[in-house]
Amino acid sequence: MNNFFNIFKKSSQQPKFKKVLSLDGGGVRAIAGIVFLKKLEAESGKKIFDSFDMFVGTSAGAFNAACLAYDGMQASELKKYWSREYLARIMKTSFFWDKASLIQARPRYESEGRVGVLNEIFSTDLLGKVKKPLVTLAYDVENRSHVIHSNFSSPEISIIDAVCASSAAPMYFP
């Protein structure tokens, strides 16, 4: 496995290709990805920010990609946002979800906790302030079409809005 990480070490030659890091959604996949990224940083001796040319993410992966592309957050620092403390803040159950009902018309979690954590990291910064190319993927349920936010095509969108749009799932988050 160590040979794999050699492609990320510094070379005297300029690479003829671009390296894109694509991160999946889903909490468990997001955490597993961070474990891999920490190993990559340790083996290569480089921050993930310096190892890739572009960051792409969906849902929880959009959060991770935004943190990495924004200002070079290290994977070890990113891991803290997936601790029990932060997850309890992000995944605060909606008042209506706990009420007895077979049909839930509201999302399971409130958005305030998620937005609060994102605000601690990104404040009111726009996608245009992200230091490396970043793409977040979302889906517009009403228009039944995909939505792509990036710092090069929609720099006026807030980072928080782009991440929230990507992680919005009607059953879980608004």
Give residue ranges: language-model regions.
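Active-site gating loop/helix substructures
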Residues: 127-174
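Small-residue-rich anion-binding loops in enzyme active sites
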Residues: 1-22, 141
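Short amphipathic alpha-helical surface micro-motifs
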Residues: 1-4, 20, 116-120, 129-131, ...
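Generic intrinsically disordered, low-complexity segments enriched for polar/acidic and small residues
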Residues: 1-5, 49, 83, 136, ...
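Surface-exposed acidic, glycine-flexible loop patches that form ligand/cofactor-binding
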Residues: 8-13, 44-49, 119-132
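Patatin-like phospholipase
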Residues: 14-22, 27-118, 148-150, 158-163
